[in-house]
Regions:
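Short beta-strand-initiation
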Residues: 1, 224-226, 269
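Catalytic cores of enzymes that engage adenine nucleotides and/or redox cofactors via long glycine-rich
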Residues: 219-223, 273
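Charge-rich, well-structured scaffold segments of protease-associated domains
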Residues: 7, 15-18, 62-217, 228, ...
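Short, Gly/Pro- and small/polar-rich lid/capping loops
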Residues: 1-10
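Active/ligand-binding-proximal structured segments within catalytic/core domains
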Residues: 11, 18-69, 143, 180, ...
Length: 420
Protein backbone atom coordinates (compact mmCIF):
# COMPACT_ATOMS: atom_id res chain seq x y z
CA UNK A 1 0.00 0.00 0.00
CA UNK A 2 1.46 3.30 -1.14
CA UNK A 3 0.48 6.78 -0.01
CA UNK A 4 0.65 9.39 -2.76
CA UNK A 5 0.28 13.15 -2.34
CA UNK A 6 -0.46 15.86 -4.88
CA UNK A 7 -0.46 19.58 -4.11
CA UNK A 8 -2.55 21.69 -6.42
CA UNK A 9 -1.26 25.13 -7.36
CA UNK A 10 -4.06 26.85 -5.44
CA UNK A 11 -3.36 24.99 -2.18
CA UNK A 12 -5.81 22.08 -2.32
CA UNK A 13 -4.08 18.87 -1.22
CA UNK A 14 -4.90 15.43 -2.60
CA UNK A 15 -3.81 12.28 -0.75
CA UNK A 16 -4.59 8.68 -1.69
CA UNK A 17 -3.70 5.17 -0.62
CA UNK A 18 -4.35 2.22 -2.91
CA UNK A 19 -5.27 -0.93 -0.95
CA UNK A 20 -4.75 -4.04 -3.11
CA UNK A 21 -7.45 -6.68 -3.11
CA UNK A 22 -10.35 -4.38 -2.23
CA UNK A 23 -13.40 -3.90 -4.41
CA UNK A 24 -14.54 -0.70 -2.68
CA UNK A 25 -13.19 2.73 -1.84
CA UNK A 26 -13.77 5.53 0.62
CA UNK A 27 -13.24 9.09 -0.49
CA UNK A 28 -14.12 12.52 0.71
CA UNK A 29 -13.32 16.16 1.24
CA UNK A 30 -12.04 17.39 4.61
CA UNK A 31 -12.19 21.13 5.32
CA UNK A 32 -10.50 22.99 8.18
CA UNK A 33 -13.81 24.57 9.11
CA UNK A 34 -14.96 23.37 12.50
CA UNK A 35 -16.40 24.76 15.67
CA UNK A 36 -13.19 26.44 16.80
CA UNK A 37 -13.10 28.48 13.59
CA UNK A 38 -16.39 30.22 14.37
CA UNK A 39 -16.80 33.65 15.90
CA UNK A 40 -19.16 33.88 18.87
CA UNK A 41 -22.06 35.03 16.70
CA UNK A 42 -21.40 32.12 14.32
CA UNK A 43 -21.45 29.34 16.92
CA UNK A 44 -23.07 26.32 15.28
CA UNK A 45 -22.81 27.51 11.70
CA UNK A 46 -20.16 24.97 10.61
CA UNK A 47 -22.54 22.18 11.60
CA UNK A 48 -25.51 23.96 10.01
CA UNK A 49 -23.52 24.26 6.78
CA UNK A 50 -22.69 20.55 6.85
CA UNK A 51 -26.43 19.80 7.01
CA UNK A 52 -27.24 22.23 4.20
CA UNK A 53 -24.73 20.62 1.84
CA UNK A 54 -27.11 17.65 1.55
CA UNK A 55 -30.19 19.80 0.91
CA UNK A 56 -29.45 20.44 -2.74
CA UNK A 57 -27.03 22.00 -5.21
CA UNK A 58 -27.42 23.87 -8.47
CA UNK A 59 -27.89 20.58 -10.34
CA UNK A 60 -29.10 18.11 -7.69
CA UNK A 61 -31.99 18.08 -5.24
CA UNK A 62 -31.60 16.57 -1.78
CA UNK A 63 -33.25 13.40 -3.08
CA UNK A 64 -30.95 13.36 -6.12
CA UNK A 65 -27.91 13.45 -3.82
CA UNK A 66 -29.12 10.54 -1.73
CA UNK A 67 -30.29 8.47 -4.69
CA UNK A 68 -27.11 9.02 -6.71
CA UNK A 69 -25.08 7.17 -4.09
CA UNK A 70 -27.67 4.72 -2.79
CA UNK A 71 -28.73 3.64 -6.30
CA UNK A 72 -25.28 2.07 -6.64
CA UNK A 73 -25.36 0.60 -3.13
CA UNK A 74 -23.05 3.21 -1.63
CA UNK A 75 -23.09 5.23 1.56
CA UNK A 76 -22.67 8.99 1.98
CA UNK A 77 -22.40 11.05 5.15
CA UNK A 78 -20.67 13.97 6.82
CA UNK A 79 -19.63 15.18 10.25
CA UNK A 80 -18.50 18.36 11.95
CA UNK A 81 -15.82 18.37 14.64
CA UNK A 82 -14.14 21.23 16.43
CA UNK A 83 -11.38 21.47 13.83
CA UNK A 84 -12.78 19.86 10.66
CA UNK A 85 -15.88 19.27 8.58
CA UNK A 86 -15.80 16.11 6.47
CA UNK A 87 -17.97 14.95 3.57
CA UNK A 88 -17.33 11.36 2.51
CA UNK A 89 -18.70 8.31 0.71
CA UNK A 90 -18.06 4.58 0.49
CA UNK A 91 -18.71 2.99 -2.90
CA UNK A 92 -17.60 0.17 -5.16
CA UNK A 93 -14.56 0.76 -7.36
CA UNK A 94 -16.49 1.52 -10.55
CA UNK A 95 -18.55 4.16 -8.77
CA UNK A 96 -15.65 6.25 -7.46
CA UNK A 97 -16.04 8.90 -10.23
CA UNK A 98 -19.74 9.25 -9.39
CA UNK A 99 -19.05 9.59 -5.67
CA UNK A 100 -16.35 12.19 -6.28
CA UNK A 101 -18.71 14.20 -8.47
CA UNK A 102 -21.45 14.16 -5.84
CA UNK A 103 -19.16 15.08 -2.95
CA UNK A 104 -17.38 17.87 -4.80
CA UNK A 105 -20.77 19.19 -5.91
CA UNK A 106 -22.20 19.43 -2.39
CA UNK A 107 -19.02 21.05 -1.09
CA UNK A 108 -18.68 23.60 -3.88
CA UNK A 109 -22.25 24.30 -4.95
CA UNK A 110 -24.73 24.19 -2.04
CA UNK A 111 -27.95 25.87 -3.13
CA UNK A 112 -28.96 27.36 0.24
CA UNK A 113 -32.62 27.44 -0.75
CA UNK A 114 -34.30 29.59 1.95
CA UNK A 115 -37.14 27.07 2.29
CA UNK A 116 -34.67 24.24 2.85
CA UNK A 117 -32.77 26.38 5.37
CA UNK A 118 -35.95 26.64 7.44
CA UNK A 119 -36.61 22.91 7.23
CA UNK A 120 -33.07 22.02 8.25
CA UNK A 121 -33.07 24.61 11.03
CA UNK A 122 -35.94 22.71 12.61
CA UNK A 123 -34.06 19.42 12.21
CA UNK A 124 -30.98 20.85 13.94
CA UNK A 125 -33.06 22.31 16.77
CA UNK A 126 -34.46 18.81 17.32
CA UNK A 127 -30.90 17.45 17.31
CA UNK A 128 -29.92 20.01 19.96
CA UNK A 129 -32.94 19.08 22.06
CA UNK A 130 -32.07 15.40 21.81
CA UNK A 131 -28.50 16.11 22.93
CA UNK A 132 -29.76 18.11 25.91
CA UNK A 133 -31.92 15.13 26.91
CA UNK A 134 -28.94 12.76 26.78
CA UNK A 135 -26.85 13.17 29.95
CA UNK A 136 -23.73 11.47 28.63
CA UNK A 137 -23.81 13.79 25.61
CA UNK A 138 -24.49 17.12 27.26
CA UNK A 139 -22.01 16.56 30.09
CA UNK A 140 -19.13 16.50 27.61
CA UNK A 141 -20.29 19.79 26.11
CA UNK A 142 -20.31 21.29 29.60
CA UNK A 143 -16.89 19.83 30.32
CA UNK A 144 -15.46 21.33 27.13
CA UNK A 145 -16.97 24.71 27.96
CA UNK A 146 -15.55 24.53 31.48
CA UNK A 147 -12.10 23.56 30.23
CA UNK A 148 -11.97 26.31 27.59
CA UNK A 149 -14.38 29.04 28.71
CA UNK A 150 -15.16 32.09 26.58
CA UNK A 151 -13.27 30.83 23.52
CA UNK A 152 -14.19 28.97 20.33
CA UNK A 153 -12.72 25.63 21.43
CA UNK A 154 -15.06 25.57 24.42
CA UNK A 155 -18.30 26.14 22.53
CA UNK A 156 -20.64 23.39 21.40
CA UNK A 157 -20.48 22.09 17.85
CA UNK A 158 -24.26 22.17 17.45
CA UNK A 159 -24.46 25.73 18.77
CA UNK A 160 -27.05 27.32 21.07
CA UNK A 161 -30.68 27.43 19.96
CA UNK A 162 -30.77 31.23 19.74
CA UNK A 163 -27.87 31.29 17.29
CA UNK A 164 -29.18 28.40 15.19
CA UNK A 165 -32.59 30.08 15.09
CA UNK A 166 -31.06 33.23 13.61
CA UNK A 167 -28.79 31.92 10.85
CA UNK A 168 -29.74 32.90 7.31
CA UNK A 169 -28.45 32.32 3.79
CA UNK A 170 -25.98 35.20 4.05
CA UNK A 171 -24.49 33.74 7.23
CA UNK A 172 -23.96 30.37 5.56
CA UNK A 173 -22.44 31.80 2.38
CA UNK A 174 -20.27 34.12 4.46
CA UNK A 175 -18.80 31.21 6.42
CA UNK A 176 -18.10 29.36 3.17
CA UNK A 177 -16.22 32.40 1.88
CA UNK A 178 -14.21 32.60 5.11
CA UNK A 179 -13.26 28.96 5.62
CA UNK A 180 -13.83 26.91 2.46
CA UNK A 181 -10.62 28.20 0.93
CA UNK A 182 -8.26 25.98 -1.10
CA UNK A 183 -5.64 26.07 1.64
CA UNK A 184 -8.16 24.48 4.00
CA UNK A 185 -9.29 21.68 1.67
CA UNK A 186 -7.95 18.12 1.63
CA UNK A 187 -9.21 15.48 -0.80
CA UNK A 188 -8.57 12.01 0.61
CA UNK A 189 -9.27 8.56 -0.83
CA UNK A 190 -8.34 5.00 0.10
CA UNK A 191 -9.10 1.51 -1.10
CA UNK A 192 -9.70 0.63 -4.74
CA UNK A 193 -8.57 4.03 -6.00
CA UNK A 194 -6.22 5.27 -8.69
CA UNK A 195 -4.17 8.26 -7.58
CA UNK A 196 -3.90 9.86 -11.01
CA UNK A 197 -7.64 9.58 -11.57
CA UNK A 198 -8.40 11.21 -8.20
CA UNK A 199 -5.92 14.00 -8.94
CA UNK A 200 -7.49 14.59 -12.35
CA UNK A 201 -10.96 14.76 -10.80
CA UNK A 202 -9.76 17.11 -8.05
CA UNK A 203 -8.07 19.43 -10.53
CA UNK A 204 -11.26 19.54 -12.59
CA UNK A 205 -13.50 20.20 -9.59
CA UNK A 206 -11.34 22.49 -7.44
CA UNK A 207 -8.77 23.90 -9.84
CA UNK A 208 -10.81 27.02 -10.60
CA UNK A 209 -10.66 28.21 -6.98
CA UNK A 210 -8.32 31.14 -6.43
CA UNK A 211 -5.43 30.48 -4.06
CA UNK A 212 -6.38 31.62 -0.57
CA UNK A 213 -5.04 30.96 2.90
CA UNK A 214 -6.99 29.26 5.61
CA UNK A 215 -7.54 32.13 8.04
CA UNK A 216 -6.39 32.55 11.61
CA UNK A 217 -7.37 30.28 14.51
CA UNK A 218 -7.58 31.58 18.07
CA UNK A 219 -5.13 29.75 20.36
CA UNK A 220 -6.57 27.50 23.05
CA UNK A 221 -6.20 28.40 26.73
CA UNK A 222 -7.18 25.71 29.25
CA UNK A 223 -8.60 27.34 32.38
CA UNK A 224 -10.71 24.71 34.11
CA UNK A 225 -13.49 25.14 36.61
CA UNK A 226 -16.70 23.42 37.67
CA UNK A 227 -20.13 23.08 36.05
CA UNK A 228 -22.73 21.39 38.27
CA UNK A 229 -26.38 20.85 37.37
CA UNK A 230 -28.64 19.19 39.93
CA UNK A 231 -31.48 17.23 38.30
CA UNK A 232 -33.74 14.36 39.24
CA UNK A 233 -32.19 11.56 37.17
CA UNK A 234 -31.58 7.89 37.86
CA UNK A 235 -27.82 8.33 37.52
CA UNK A 236 -25.34 10.90 38.76
CA UNK A 237 -22.93 11.65 35.92
CA UNK A 238 -19.48 13.14 36.27
CA UNK A 239 -16.69 14.00 33.87
CA UNK A 240 -13.25 15.16 34.95
CA UNK A 241 -10.62 16.56 32.60
CA UNK A 242 -6.93 17.46 32.77
CA UNK A 243 -5.07 19.39 30.09
CA UNK A 244 -2.73 17.28 27.97
CA UNK A 245 -0.51 18.08 24.96
CA UNK A 246 -1.78 18.95 21.51
CA UNK A 247 -1.34 16.45 18.71
CA UNK A 248 1.92 17.98 17.44
CA UNK A 249 3.64 17.24 20.77
CA UNK A 250 5.27 13.77 20.97
CA UNK A 251 4.06 13.56 24.58
CA UNK A 252 0.57 12.99 23.18
CA UNK A 253 1.49 9.29 23.01
CA UNK A 254 2.48 9.29 26.67
CA UNK A 255 -0.90 10.81 27.51
CA UNK A 256 -2.67 8.11 25.51
CA UNK A 257 -0.75 5.32 27.20
CA UNK A 258 -1.46 6.68 30.68
CA UNK A 259 -5.12 7.12 29.79
CA UNK A 260 -5.27 3.51 28.60
CA UNK A 261 -3.72 2.19 31.81
CA UNK A 262 -6.11 4.30 33.86
CA UNK A 263 -9.38 3.68 32.06
CA UNK A 264 -8.96 2.14 28.62
CA UNK A 265 -10.71 -1.20 28.67
CA UNK A 266 -11.79 -3.98 31.01
CA UNK A 267 -8.29 -4.54 32.37
CA UNK A 268 -7.80 -0.86 33.24
CA UNK A 269 -7.40 0.30 36.81
CA UNK A 270 -10.64 2.27 36.98
CA UNK A 271 -12.74 -0.50 35.46
CA UNK A 272 -11.26 -3.13 37.74
CA UNK A 273 -11.44 -1.10 40.94
CA UNK A 274 -14.69 0.82 40.47
CA UNK A 275 -16.80 -1.74 38.63
CA UNK A 276 -15.36 -5.22 39.05
CA UNK A 277 -14.26 -5.01 42.69
CA UNK A 278 -16.69 -2.49 44.20
CA UNK A 279 -19.67 -2.50 41.83
CA UNK A 280 -19.95 1.28 41.98
CA UNK A 281 -20.86 1.83 38.33
CA UNK A 282 -21.71 0.25 35.01
CA UNK A 283 -19.73 2.66 32.81
CA UNK A 284 -16.36 4.18 33.60
CA UNK A 285 -13.55 5.06 31.23
CA UNK A 286 -10.69 7.42 30.50
CA UNK A 287 -9.81 8.79 27.08
CA UNK A 288 -7.69 11.46 25.46
CA UNK A 289 -8.54 13.95 22.76
CA UNK A 290 -6.08 16.28 21.10
CA UNK A 291 -6.31 19.52 19.15
CA UNK A 292 -3.60 21.48 17.39
CA UNK A 293 -2.43 23.28 20.52
CA UNK A 294 -4.07 21.56 23.50
CA UNK A 295 -5.70 18.33 24.56
CA UNK A 296 -7.74 16.71 27.30
CA UNK A 297 -7.50 13.54 29.33
CA UNK A 298 -11.10 12.89 30.30
CA UNK A 299 -12.55 10.48 32.86
CA UNK A 300 -16.28 9.75 32.78
CA UNK A 301 -18.57 7.63 34.92
CA UNK A 302 -22.17 7.39 36.02
CA UNK A 303 -23.50 5.98 39.28
CA UNK A 304 -26.30 6.28 41.83
CA UNK A 305 -26.74 9.33 44.03
CA UNK A 306 -25.51 7.47 47.11
CA UNK A 307 -22.26 6.41 45.43
CA UNK A 308 -21.22 9.54 43.55
CA UNK A 309 -18.98 10.90 46.30
CA UNK A 310 -17.13 7.62 46.72
CA UNK A 311 -16.76 7.09 42.98
CA UNK A 312 -15.34 10.55 42.31
CA UNK A 313 -12.89 10.23 45.19
CA UNK A 314 -11.90 6.74 44.07
CA UNK A 315 -11.18 8.06 40.58
CA UNK A 316 -8.80 10.69 41.92
CA UNK A 317 -7.14 8.18 44.25
CA UNK A 318 -6.58 5.70 41.41
CA UNK A 319 -5.01 8.43 39.32
CA UNK A 320 -2.59 9.27 42.13
CA UNK A 321 -1.82 5.62 42.72
CA UNK A 322 -1.08 5.03 39.05
CA UNK A 323 1.41 7.89 39.07
CA UNK A 324 3.29 6.05 41.82
CA UNK A 325 3.12 2.41 40.84
CA UNK A 326 2.32 1.86 37.16
CA UNK A 327 4.12 -1.28 36.09
CA UNK A 328 6.02 -2.20 32.91
CA UNK A 329 3.40 -4.90 32.28
CA UNK A 330 0.62 -2.29 32.29
CA UNK A 331 2.57 -0.05 29.92
CA UNK A 332 3.22 -2.98 27.58
CA UNK A 333 -0.49 -3.84 27.59
CA UNK A 334 -1.43 -0.22 26.86
CA UNK A 335 1.05 -0.08 23.99
CA UNK A 336 -0.38 -3.29 22.56
CA UNK A 337 -3.94 -1.97 22.85
CA UNK A 338 -3.04 1.25 21.08
CA UNK A 339 -1.13 -0.42 18.26
CA UNK A 340 -3.68 -3.17 17.72
CA UNK A 341 -6.57 -0.72 17.78
CA UNK A 342 -4.85 1.49 15.23
CA UNK A 343 -3.82 -1.34 12.91
CA UNK A 344 -7.12 -3.23 13.07
CA UNK A 345 -9.03 -0.03 12.42
CA UNK A 346 -6.98 0.67 9.33
CA UNK A 347 -8.19 -2.51 7.64
CA UNK A 348 -11.16 -0.36 6.57
CA UNK A 349 -10.74 2.07 3.64
CA UNK A 350 -12.94 4.56 5.50
CA UNK A 351 -10.51 4.57 8.43
CA UNK A 352 -7.58 4.86 6.04
CA UNK A 353 -9.08 7.86 4.24
CA UNK A 354 -9.86 9.51 7.58
CA UNK A 355 -6.31 8.92 8.79
CA UNK A 356 -4.77 10.33 5.61
CA UNK A 357 -6.81 13.52 5.86
CA UNK A 358 -6.15 13.95 9.58
CA UNK A 359 -2.39 13.49 9.24
CA UNK A 360 -2.20 15.82 6.25
CA UNK A 361 -4.03 18.47 8.26
CA UNK A 362 -1.59 18.07 11.16
CA UNK A 363 1.77 17.48 9.48
CA UNK A 364 1.20 18.30 5.80
CA UNK A 365 2.52 14.80 5.17
CA UNK A 366 1.53 11.24 6.13
CA UNK A 367 3.87 9.65 8.68
CA UNK A 368 4.14 5.92 8.14
CA UNK A 369 2.50 3.41 10.44
CA UNK A 370 5.98 2.27 11.40
CA UNK A 371 6.84 5.81 12.49
CA UNK A 372 3.76 5.97 14.68
CA UNK A 373 4.43 2.54 16.19
CA UNK A 374 7.98 3.64 17.03
CA UNK A 375 6.64 6.67 18.91
CA UNK A 376 4.25 4.47 20.88
CA UNK A 377 6.99 1.94 21.67
CA UNK A 378 9.32 4.74 22.79
CA UNK A 379 7.12 5.59 25.79
CA UNK A 380 8.61 4.06 28.94
CA UNK A 381 7.11 3.29 32.30
CA UNK A 382 9.09 6.20 33.71
CA UNK A 383 7.66 8.53 31.07
CA UNK A 384 4.09 7.53 31.90
CA UNK A 385 4.62 7.84 35.66
CA UNK A 386 6.26 11.25 35.29
CA UNK A 387 3.45 12.43 33.03
CA UNK A 388 0.78 11.27 35.49
CA UNK A 389 2.67 12.81 38.40
CA UNK A 390 2.73 16.13 36.56
CA UNK A 391 -1.05 16.09 36.17
CA UNK A 392 -1.52 15.17 39.83
CA UNK A 393 0.90 17.82 41.03
CA UNK A 394 -0.68 20.55 38.94
CA UNK A 395 -4.18 19.47 40.05
CA UNK A 396 -5.77 21.80 37.49
CA UNK A 397 -9.04 20.26 36.37
CA UNK A 398 -12.33 20.85 34.64
CA UNK A 399 -15.25 19.13 36.36
CA UNK A 400 -18.80 18.62 35.08
CA UNK A 401 -21.57 17.00 37.13
CA UNK A 402 -25.17 16.26 36.17
CA UNK A 403 -28.05 14.58 37.96
CA UNK A 404 -28.44 13.88 41.70
CA UNK A 405 -24.96 15.20 42.42
CA UNK A 406 -25.41 17.12 45.68
CA UNK A 407 -23.05 14.71 47.46
CA UNK A 408 -20.32 14.93 44.84
CA UNK A 409 -17.14 16.67 46.03
CA UNK A 410 -16.36 20.10 44.64
CA UNK A 411 -13.44 20.81 42.35
CA UNK A 412 -11.45 22.47 45.14
CA UNK A 413 -11.84 19.37 47.30
CA UNK A 414 -10.53 17.21 44.46
CA UNK A 415 -7.54 19.50 44.05
CA UNK A 416 -6.79 19.10 47.74
CA UNK A 417 -7.14 15.34 47.49
CA UNK A 418 -4.74 15.26 44.54
CA UNK A 419 -2.23 17.38 46.44
CA UNK A 420 -2.47 15.38 49.69
Amino acid sequence: MTVEIHRMSNGVRVVTEHMPGLASASLGVWVAAGGRHERLEQNGIAHFLEHMAFKGTAKRSALDIAEAIEDVGGYINAYTSREMTAYYARVLENDVPLAFDVISDIVLNPAFDPREVEVERHVILQEIGQAHDTPDDVIFDWLQETAYPDQPLGRTILGPTDKVSSFGVSDLSGFVAERYAPGNIIVSAAGAVDHDAIVKAAEAAFGHLAAQGGGATDPAAFRGGEHRVEKDLEQAHFALAFETPGYRDPAVYTAQIFSTVLGGGMSSRLFQEAREKRGLCYTIFAQTGAYADSGLLTIYAGTGADDIEGLVNLTVDEMKRAADDMTPAEIARARAQMKAGMLMGLESPSSRAERLARLMSIWDRVPSLEETVELIDAVTTGDAKAFAAGLVEKADTALALYGPVSRAPEREALAGRLAA
